[in-house]
């Protein structure tokens, strides 16, 4: 029988205090049957992305413990960072990897949301495949106004009523929980400190503004450099190299260039192979030509 593997990639609103990050990771790692694969902290975004995998019961319990720990240690009234956010645990996506379906992940998201709402008294919004409201499928729509805006609206605006939990915000804010396919978090840095250029480029490449399908983008300023921060929601249909080349063309319009890029968290191997194939212009290439693919079979 195929082992069930589900990935969870929660984003926590803390990227500067190592003690807090370590405590959240420890809470997740303490669950039997869960393996933490990656921890990526960003001080400018003031955000940490943790990637872990496990079976359905273990992954659900680990996510709950991570959310509970974050709620104890992160005060959203004091939080500052470049990245949009709603709560101490901002977003918790579940991703089917092996022996699991999207429906399995939707069920986990709903169970976890109900528990977080009742036991931790944190408002929960379901998004992507788990959304109960079509208007909440897109994370950016759910997160609009961020923590500060939601705090003003949640009690009085019916459209901002959570799926689970109270219609009020405590210091842990709100949490968005859902199910989705694999996503690539990808950032590109420009040789300028003009954030308006990054914002214009982000507007050009993101789908919601008429750009590339399956691309979400923001223009930010990180460590004095303009950054185009992106989520690539379907790398099979909009590959990394297509995004890079479009940003290069857009940057040239403003007299700037791409100086570096970064991946946040883990990335599917095929996405990187597709990028290598494009830039190396390889003909007739197959995964059988990769040394490590044979070693993995042993």
Identify the function of each model-found stretch.
Residues 2-298:
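Long, contiguous binding/interaction regions
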């Amino acid at each position: 029988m195929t082992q069930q593997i589900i990935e969870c990639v929660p984003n926590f609103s803390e990227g500067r205090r190592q003690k807090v990050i370590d405590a959240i990771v420890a809470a997740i790692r303490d669950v039997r049957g869960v393996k933490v694969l990656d921890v990526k902290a960003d001080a400018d975004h003031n955000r940490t992305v943790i990637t872990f995998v496990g079976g359905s019961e273990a992954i659900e319990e680990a996510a709950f413990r991570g959310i509970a720990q974050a709620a104890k240690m992160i005060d959203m009234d004091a939080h500052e960072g470049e990245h949009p956010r709603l709560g101490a645990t901002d977003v918790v996506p579940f991703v089917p990897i092996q022996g699991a379906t999207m429906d399995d992940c939707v069920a986990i998201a709903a169970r976890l949301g109900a528990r977080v709402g009742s036991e931790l008294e944190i408002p929960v919004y379901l998004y992507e495949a788990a959304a109960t409201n079509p208007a909440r499928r897109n994370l950016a729509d759910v997160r609009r106004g961020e923590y500060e805006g939601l705090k003003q609206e949640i009690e009085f605006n019916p459209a901002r009523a959570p799926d689970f939990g109270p219609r009020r915000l405590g210091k842990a804010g709100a949490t968005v929980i859902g199910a989705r396919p694999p996503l690539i978090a990808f950032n590109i840095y420009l040789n300028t400190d003009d954030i308006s250029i990054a914002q214009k480029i982000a507007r050009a490449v993101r789908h919601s503004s008429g750009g590339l399908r399956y691309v979400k983008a923001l223009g930010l300023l990180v460590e004095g450099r303009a950054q185009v921060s992106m989520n690539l929601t379907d790398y099979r249909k909009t590959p990394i190299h297509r995004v890079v080349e479009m940003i290069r063309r857009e940057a040239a319009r403003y007299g700037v260039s791409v100086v570096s890029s970064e991946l946040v968290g883990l990335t599917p191997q095929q996405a990187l192979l597709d990028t290598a194939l494009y830039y190396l212009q390889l003909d007739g290439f197959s995964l059988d030509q990769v040394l490590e693919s044979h070693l993995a079979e042993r």
